[in-house]
Amino acid sequence: ICRNHIENVQQAIPACVGYGAAPGRPAFQHSICTSVNHVVCHGIPSESKVLKNGDILNIDVTVIKDGYHGDTNMMYIVGGETSILANRLCQVAQEAMYRGMATVKDGSYLGDVGYAIQQYVESERFSVVREYCGHGIGKVFHDEPQVLHYGQKGTGMILEAGMTFTIEPMVNAGVWQTKLLGDKWTVVTKDHKLSAQYEHTILVTKTGIEVLTARPEEDLSRFM
């Protein structure tokens, strides 16, 4: 269903299909990633795994449109209600993304993004995943720079108008460490506690950013 919608309705190409083959790792064979509960990222869709009310689900979509990549993901609460902890985790992950985005403009430092995210997440008693990060994006799916979601203010690359990259903090309810499963794709929390993630692809402008993957229902007035 997802692949049909991407190809025939959006007139785009699902970038994940056939992506990422490497020695000891098969290419990804699905059009989206689906990460449930303690899965941090790159979860593989499965017809045998049944979602339950209260599960938190991340859907990650990357498409190629007119030769350029767009990468975005967000959280969904199965059944509309979940635990207080899971609900707060999802809210913090989204706000962390926004706080990282708010630091970006022509002349700002890349390290400011990670600093803003880490400071906020840890103030909420959660942790930021270190092993995976945002990335440059455009005609290439994964490109420089690496966009860390932790770090020090005033460090790293100086950003310039015209750059495009993703900000996609992965926020864990427990420790930040993760584990890669035997399928060589699925990443889970090391302590099996919940994880949540939000992602946007952004364009750096002279005064701030343009959110290239903005959703119609999303309030992005703080970036206008």
Name these PLM-found stretches.
Residues 1-224:
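Active-site neighborhoods and metal-handling regions in enzymes and metal-associated proteins
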